Amino acid sequence: MRNLGCTVAVLMGTGLSLLATACGGGGGTNTPPPPTTYVLTVHSVTPASGVVVTATPTDINNVSNGNTSFSLSYNSGAKVTLVAAATANGNNFSSWSGCTTSNGITCAVTMNANTTVTANYTGPTIASVTVAPNPTPATIGTQVQFTATVSGTGSFSSDVTWTVLAPSGSTLSPGTINAFGLYTTPYPAPATVTVVATSTQDTSKSGSSAVTLVAPATAAGPALTVDAGNQTHAISPYIYGMNAYLLDADTAKNTNITISRWGGDSTSRYNYIKDVTNSAADWYFENGDGTGGDGMPAVSGMSAFDALVTSNNTIGAKTLGTVPVQGWVAKDNYQCSFPETTYPIQYSYDYGNPLHCGDGENSDQTKITGNDPTVTSTAVGPSWAGDWVAYLVGEFGSAANGGVAIYDLDNEPSWWDATHRDVHPSPFTYDEVTNNGIATALAVKTADPTAAVSGPVMDYWWDYFYSKQDVESGWSTGPCNAPWSSPLDRSNHNGTPLIEYYLQQFAAYEAANNLRLLDYLDLHTYFAATYNGHSVAFTTAGDTGTQQARLNSTRVFWDPTYTDPNFLQPNYPTDPNYTTSCSPPAQAPQLIPMMRTWVANDYPGTKLAIDEYNWGGLESINGALAQADILGIFGREGLDLGTFWPTTHPSTQMPGLTAFTIYRNYDGANSTFGDMALASTSADQAALSVYGALRTSDNAVTVVVINKTYGDLTATLSLANLTPNGAAKVFLYSNANLAAIVAQPDLTVTPPPTGSTTSTLNPTFPAQSITVLVVPKT
């Protein structure tokens, strides 16, 4: 029958059946309606994205996988199987959620509605951290390597951070531990410390090791010898000096110093007429009262420098002054070189100053140039120094009659173009520092022929050999960009090293004029070791590694086998060891022998001065040992003048400065170390240093022994060519009592046996100690 597009329905009623027909006027169809589709959304947790999930079967768009989060479309009733990755971003699969059923990484979904499923992952977990060795002893003065074992689940991190803790209530340092678990012991040390390793992934998980710190057992030390019959040279009393900066009268008196220096950056521009100075780059280039020169309180009715001379005279110490060579002095007590009103955008300001003085740097820390030096300062020439010396002679007498003994020719030309760049922006040259030095020295000597002059007061290894102009030119000259790379100034002066040229010119002046203008070759020697990337100078004692580096680096003053990578060979092209390499080898500085050689070659008769140095650790016994070693070296090596520069207020640094008391006031009655050096040797200077001297006032042999180790050492001290006249007096300074040098029981001196001229003592030298022995001699 032909389909006419009719719809037929059978209507059933009570006992009746009706056939209903409805026919349309157009054509008809029998195509079924489209199937229903649903969306399957796939998420992930930990991580929230990027997890690869595969789907079977493919969806209606022929897609079978994706990276979370993503969606698939399926017809109603479709049965879909999803498979997730077992790990994602190092995290482990844990479960599915939203599935019809799931089994491990497989998720089954029947698509009867829009459905969202989530693949859940868990991050790696840390279960525990253990530290080995645990427990363990650690001998003071050594290092211990610790390892950490981290346990956990998943792709966890084994990284840890290391710390070391002192016992609760302890004020002693626990030592240090580096990022790799290498522990360095402290001294002085608590009885125990705890080394802790903490997981970087989960800081709630850590492990520890109990460390017992033990002193080394008493051991036999090296043989020591002092030859009373071998007097090598007189020891200058002026090696026991300090800089006046922050030096209070009590410290100066108790340490019985012999000379005090008015020096440092703030003294370069001191104006004696107005008693004002400029702080230079040290503090915002500010003018201020003259007390800025030494940091001491003002004395009524007296200029700062005059007050220092008066104070020094009271305790019997000589005064070493500083006269300007760089050409400027402060003109008042309030101006500054870079006030905010003139330079409104600087990196830093001193808002405590009414002028809001700036640091002379732009906001990006580039240097401001072209400032007017006359805002703060007055230009002066050599006659200024001469007039000042004449004034001082009138006030205090000539040097020969108790006045100012020595004058430094300014301070550290090396840094004039940095520290004093507001008035001296250009680096110094050979001619400037030499010619101005000669002219200023002549003015000083004319005003006081009995005064001594010291110069060039040079800091910085490279400026011993090159002018600062050379050094800065070298820094910008390839391929090495090194201090020696462009030595035009040196080349224009016959290739002569700067210090030697300086000496030669003063020698030439004397030869032509029969007048010595330079009495001391003067250097600043900040040559303390660098340890773990930091200088040990101007710091606290540190761990035993730092302490040992500090003590070892005193060798820089004398030892031909000691080198430091900071001090390379000068590398001038005519040097016999010159190399074109940009990494020339280190050179042993041998500072005092080097100075002595320069003088012998270039200006015989010139004395040797080091009027700034600092080895740090001064709050501790370690600083005292280093300072005592330096003073002993100064005496043994024949230095003529030395003045220590403080870390901070000397009264708070007395453990370190007690080294001066060892040599100048060991018994509290101003008894001193001898004044005539005796040949003295130690079989191991790194363990026990020994310095001997004859005290000519009473014929006693004085000996200083420094135990640099962390254990007690017994040693035989042989006194050659000495017959004792009684027992030895013994004085000890150690960590057992940092407040005082303590008298010990007398020590028997065994006289020479028949056929010998050598007496002996057999003391025990406590760990980290300084011992003074006074042996009466027939």
Enumerate the language-model features and the residues they cover.
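Carbohydrate-binding surface patches
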Residues: D684-G726, V730-Y733, Q768-V774
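Glycan-recognition and catalytic regions of carbohydrate-active enzymes
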Residues: S620, L631-T702, A727, L738-A739
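C-terminal beta-strand-rich structural cap/linker in extracellular carbohydrate-active enzymes
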Residues: A113-G123, V749-T778
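Catalytic-core region of carbohydrate-active enzymes that cleave or remodel glycosidic bonds
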Residues: A439, A443, Q504-A512, T579-T648, ...
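Surface-exposed interfaces of beta-sheet-rich extracellular modules
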Residues: A78-T106
